[in-house]
């Protein structure tokens, strides 16, 4: 069997042989016929300008990806074609105590290019209930979280929960052992009182440093928490124990970033820096902090910097809620 290079060489030899025969025959005819000679010269003069013309892409080499970002040159305002949801704790509405306060905020956002019909202000009772069913359905979603050092809910874990999409399934710890298979595989516990204990198992399903029949020997990972994202050693089976009546535990895979969600911490000595959590890959900047004074001051600050915040986000590509992508069963 001939190689590709050999085949190409044979084709070139045959081509040049026939070309030489044609040229020889043409020269012979031109010598005997002035009319044929004039016709050949006319064809050569007609074709030559095309041969030396500018090449606009026939042989342009492709050296990289064609999937490049094309900047938007229209400079359209985002607010004219997008919806904006701002989520706030109900205590803000109680403190403001003004029936028209939402309309006021909407009118102020109008000065920043957001039509009043595109802005939605949604309150939530507490972070526990909100984290269980966030309903982040706008093109851009901003969550205001008031700092509370006494809260059982870990706000950095709430940030990880909201800033990523998760694919989850319920865990039946009475029937099965569970293991985490990768860095993106976590267990998410939610409820009013989540105390999680585990017993790692060896290949013979015997406890490592614990007894599978004695919960008192299990390692305790959380204590009376409302939300916990649990990380254990990958590739090791675990027997899990928790109070089913006050907590739900789900086996989850962290998927893509929710780039249309941003979290603003209100008050507190330091910012929720979810990017510093070793569980978070890749790093992100959609979590920030503003000083706490009064809730009116908070909303004024949000309005003033709304477009700066939006620039760190991306418009949603699908609806995000518990029934679709947040905690999909």
UniProtKB/Swiss-Prot annotation:
Glycans are attached at residues 72, 241, 321. It is found in: Virion; Host endoplasmic reticulum lumen. It holds the Pfam family VP7. GO terms for cellular component: host cell endoplasmic reticulum lumen; T=13 icosahedral viral capsid; viral outer capsid. It comes from the Viruses. N-glycosylated. Ca(2+) 1 binds at residues 98, 209, 217, 219. Its main location: virion. Ca(2+) 2 binds at residues 180, 231-232, 234, 304. One of its GO terms (molecular function) is metal ion binding. Keywords: Calcium, Capsid protein, Disulfide bond, Glycoprotein, Host endoplasmic reticulum, Host-virus interaction, Metal-binding, Outer capsid protein, Signal, T=13 icosahedral capsid protein, Virion. The keyword ATP-binding does not apply. Residues 1-53 form the signal peptide. Disulfide bonds join 85-138, 168-252, 194-247, 199-210. Some rotavirus strains are neuraminidase-sensitive and require sialic acid to attach to the cell surface. Some rotavirus strains are integrin-dependent. Some rotavirus strains depend on ganglioside for their entry into the host cell. Hsp70 also seems to be involved in the entry of some strains. Calcium-binding protein that interacts with rotavirus cell receptors once the initial attachment by VP4 has been achieved. Rotavirus attachment and entry into the host cell probably involves multiple sequential contacts between the outer capsid proteins VP4 and VP7, and the cell receptors. Following entry into the host cell, low intracellular or intravesicular Ca(2+) concentration probably causes the calcium-stabilized VP7 trimers to dissociate from the virion. This step is probably necessary for the membrane-disrupting entry step and the release of VP4, which is locked onto the virion by VP7. Homotrimer; disulfide-linked. 2 Ca(2+) ions bound at each subunit interface in the trimer hold the trimer together. Interacts with the intermediate capsid protein VP6. Interacts with the outer capsid protein VP5*. Belongs to the rotavirus VP7 family. This is Outer capsid glycoprotein VP7. It comes from Rotavirus A (isolate RVA/Cow/Germany/993/1983/G18P[17]) (RV-A). The lineage of its organism: Viruses, Riboviria, Orthornavirae, Duplornaviricota, Resentoviricetes.
